[in-house]
Structure formats: C-alpha cells, structure tokens
Amino acid sequence: MFNKFWFDAKNINCFKNGFKVIKDLNLKIAYSENVILIGPNGSGKSSLIEVINRNIYPVIANESKLKIFGKELINLWELRKRISTVNNDIKNRINPNLQVFDLILSGLYGRYCFIQNKSERDSYKVEKIMKKMNISNLSKKYFSYLSDGEKKISLIARALIKKPDILILDEC
C-alpha cells in the first residue's frame, strides 16, 4: 500500500544540547507538496531538518510517532539517497580548493572531497546538470572564489545530481 506522506510526525519532541528544540510537532508532508517553513530564529526550522535527516532523534513516547517514507526505522543510506539537503552546514564542509565540477561530482558519492576515479558517465552527468542550471562557466572555478550566489547554485546542482525524491533548502 502506497503512503502518500513521505514525512509523518505525530506529537514529537526533540532535545539538542539539553534544550527542547521541537515541542509537540504534528506534521504530515505529502510527496506532491512543496513546503516552505517560515518562523523566527530559534523556532525549530533547522532542527526539523535535522530530524528529517536523522541527525537528531525525537524522544520516544507512547503518543508519538515519526515515519519517513512510511517507515519508523529507515536505513540511513536509503535516506541519504532519497533526500538532498543544502544548508550552511554543507557549505562549511566543502573543501574551498575544490573546483565546481568536482564539487558537483562529489554529490553522486555523498562525499565532500575530490573524487579521483570518475567515470565518463559521471562526468557526463555533471556536465549535463551544469548546462541545465546555466553554470558551465563555473566548472573550473574554485569554491572559495565563488560569490555567495554562485556557491548556492553550485550546491543546489550538487544536491540535484543524484536525483533525490526530496530536496531541502535551508537558508538558500
């Protein structure tokens, strides 16, 4: 049976560094929905993304449940294949001496570094997405020399290259 919700949270609470960052969250997100979360700083938007990516876990209580892609327990490798996230944490992990071509290529492998043995097929995928996003001119530029806008679009291309089911953009 197909579940139309890829994210289904009922009454979840999460703590981070001893502080409650999510309180009694009830939220369902369907596959067909585009969602924008708006709120003041400290309201839990980025923490929700950490829950979705399984970087933090909710407190388990009788009344609560959390399903991602219809599963209460999901393999992290499956999750990483199906969800791509672009946020400041990702931007800070990127080697500043990586060229944009290699940055985007690294998204296929879920790494943040230079990939030595790239196949022709993978190189073609990178060239294709760079052309589609109109950033082919950035191919040989180093990440550290890009403008903020160029960094963001390059990171979005990196996230999209693996064709995720879900794309999450945090402060992009």
Describe the predicted segments one by one.
Residues 7, 21-24, 139:
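Conserved structural motif at the start of ABC-family nucleotide-binding domains
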Residues 38-40:
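The feature captures the beta-strand-to-loop junction immediately N-terminal to the Walker
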Residues 48, 156:
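Hydrophobic anchor residue at the start of the ABC signature
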Residues 53:
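Helix-to-loop junction immediately C-terminal to a conserved catalytic motif
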Residues 68-84:
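ABC ATPase NBD coupling module
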Residues 117-118, 142-146, 150:
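Conserved ABC ATPase signature
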Residues 120-138, 163, 168:
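Conserved ABC ATPase "signature" region
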